[in-house]
Amino acid sequence: MKMNPDDIRELRDRTGLGLSDCKKALEECDGDIKKAVDKLRTIGLAKADKKSDRVASDGLVAMCLTENCGVLIELNCETDFVARNEKFIELVLNLASIAHQERCTSVDELKNAKYESIGTVQEAIMNGTSVLGEKLELSKLCYLEAKDGVIAGYVHGDVCGLGKIGALIALQSSGDKAKLQEIGKQIAMHVVAMKPEALSIDDLDQMKLNNERSIIEEQVRSLNKPEEVAKKIVDGRMAKYYEEVVLLEQKFIKDDKMKISDFIKSSELSAVKLSNYELLVLGDAD
């Protein structure tokens, strides 16, 4: 049976697989495109499964944002060459959009979400593995929602909403939403640059905090200072530590004469609260 070239091309467009695979599938399915699509999806998933033990260490971070909801995802591949491929970029942007639309709060939720014309997101990722020839892996997802305020965000990269590192900011206020968005974006850019470990001092891991204080106290003890002087030195060094790792205590990257908490207070809007943030860095362990 001679295959229609238009059917072969349509099959290639729908599956992303090669012309020879598409022609063979159509021949085996007596020209039935729907059956051929199912067959090629099976082939694609089988090819993807063979690559499952390989390491996906490159990739992209993508953001999808509306006024009161934002999501960041990380999709990994094996090389920068594939990370710059149009099909990979299209896939990662689609996944961010689906995660936002479905309000996914975890990687597993997104993997099980529906992906139009393919099945699930996980099947779309495995299909991408087959088409691009590298292992693809959805590794991280960050979700933020603000009921009384805005979600702002920033991703550092050449394309808007796409790069290697991104941040989401939740601001609570009844003030002007456009001004809140601008404040939030500036804080998100700060977070991307300074990579804080916690929102406030109270949010720091207590064991890590106690360990840091113990180290500083041991260092100061070796100075043989009077107890009152030693306490002031310890408090000063702890304050310096907070400035390094706590977002609200960090000096604002655009004006180091003020902390982030001061920058928020200095806005023309009243009662603005930074309630949460998320930072996603490509390749970083959770």
Curated annotation (Swiss-Prot):
This is Elongation factor Ts. It holds the Pfam family EF_TS. GO terms for molecular function: translation elongation factor activity. The keyword S-adenosyl-L-methionine does not apply. Transmembrane segments: none annotated. Associates with the EF-Tu.GDP complex and induces the exchange of GDP to GTP. It remains bound to the aminoacyl-tRNA.EF-Tu.GTP complex up to the GTP hydrolysis stage on the ribosome. It is found in: Cytoplasm. It comes from Wolbachia pipientis wMel. InterPro entries: EF-Ts_dimer_sf, Transl_elong_EFTs/EF1B, Transl_elong_EFTs/EF1B_dimer, Transl_elong_Ts_CS, UBA-like_sf. SUPFAM superfamilies: Elongation factor Ts (EF-Ts), dimerisation domain, UBA-like. One of its GO terms (cellular component) is cytoplasm. It comes from the Bacteria. Residues 79-82 are annotated as: Involved in Mg(2+) ion dislocation from EF-Tu. The keyword Protein biosynthesis applies. Belongs to the EF-Ts family. Keywords: Cytoplasm, Elongation factor, Protein biosynthesis.
